[in-house]
């Protein structure tokens, strides 16, 4: 019996063959969701816990960079990947510099390249989750220490007044 995939990957591309090929290539390691539009991708993000988002740059209504920018705000821990068969170099550079994407892939890709990139994205997701958990733990610890300092200050005032 095969293990249940740990990470969910959303592929957004208006060309169904792309989503199908990514699904066929990665379905043993990842739960792969496919969307043919940004609107469908947003709905799948709303309905599922998605860890990795892959989107094409050139789509109707909205570019991949615009879509990933929106997803960064709504789902900051999801690792965002952009791919294109065209040389939209300025848009890609801007997206990378603004932190909207983790990785850029050029179509067509080699299967090994795609598998490695998605595995790296899954590892990055795990790092981000661990980092968020550690940050939360440290905030709780700081809060507890502040409470303890307040109690000690009150005790010092009480002892000085006695």
Where are these regions (language model features)?
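Two-component/phosphorelay signaling modules centered on CheY-like receiver
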Residues: 4, 16-34
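Helix N-cap/capping motif at the beta->alpha junctions
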Residues: 34-43, 64
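Active-site residues of response regulator receiver
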Residues: 56, 84
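Receiver (REC) domain active-site loop signature in two-component systems and cognate sites
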Residues: 59
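C-terminal output helix
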Residues: 87-90, 109-118, 122
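C-terminal output/effector regions of signal-responsive regulators
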Residues: 126-162
């Amino acid at each position: 019996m095969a293990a249940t995939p740990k990470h969910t990957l959303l592929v957004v591309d208006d060309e169904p063959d792309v989503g199908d090929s990514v699904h066929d290539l990665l379905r043993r390691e990842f739960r792969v969701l496919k969307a043919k539009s940004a609107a469908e991708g947003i709905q799948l993000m709303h309905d599922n816990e998605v860890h990795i988002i892959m989107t094409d740059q050139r789509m109707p209504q909205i570019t991949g960079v615009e879509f990933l920018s929106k997803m960064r705000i709504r789902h900051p821990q999801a690792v965002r990947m952009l791919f294109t068969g065209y040389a939209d170099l300025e848009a890609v550079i801007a997206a990378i510099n603004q932190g909207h994407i983790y990785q850029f892939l050029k179509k067509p890709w080699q299967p090994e390249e795609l598998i490695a990139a998605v595995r790296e994205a899954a590892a990055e997701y795990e790092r981000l989750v661990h980092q968020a958990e550690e940050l939360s733990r440290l905030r709780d610890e700081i809060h507890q220490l502040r409470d303890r300092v307040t109690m000690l200050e009150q005790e010092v005032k009480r002892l000085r007044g006695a």
